[in-house]
């Protein structure tokens, strides 16, 4: 039996900080600097706390100053979501480069898990995105989030709708695991071992899906 590839370390779960510090005020406000400030704000305060006035306070300015660069809170949140999606896509493409099948799946899953724990606010923004909608740019970004995984699934012989559904199933499993970790449900369990086992079982299911014509056997 071939040796199983080793899962990367998730880098551990960071402990909550003692106090929230203000984000340094940008030398000059721009849409990009506001989005950057919002990303830092998210990890410190959380998605539900993100408002124009709260972010402006963290940036050392007033709310009206931000409206010179963003149209509304929803415009800001949309820009943040798209930025987070782009960052995750870049990360998955980087760690998965040159890898295939179980090796790629394990490495990408580990990177996804690590990102969620080290950037909880950004991860929350990512998982609140709809998969469709009336905004072409946003819809394209959300669909693009599955692209790195779909590319890896092609090494199992999956493509088209079959690969897209498999990617959604894979994402659902990772998201569920990460949420359980974040809520502390599995604090007394060797989560690294459980995570590796889960990902390898998912990979085996992809293999069976190809063998059995699109349906993973049980």
From Swiss-Prot:
Residues 28-88 form the HTH tetR-type domain. The keyword tRNA-binding does not apply. PROSITE patterns: HTH_TETR_2. Keywords: DNA-binding, Phosphoprotein, Transcription, Transcription regulation. It comes from the Bacteria. The keyword Isomerase does not apply. One of its GO terms (biological process) is regulation of DNA-templated transcription. One of its GO terms (cellular component) is plasma membrane. Residues 51-70 bind DNA. The modification Phosphothreonine is found at residue 57. Phosphorylated on Thr-57 by PknH. Residues 1-24 are annotated as: Disordered. GO terms for molecular function: DNA-binding transcription factor activity; transcription cis-regulatory region binding. This is Uncharacterized HTH-type transcriptional regulator Rv0681.
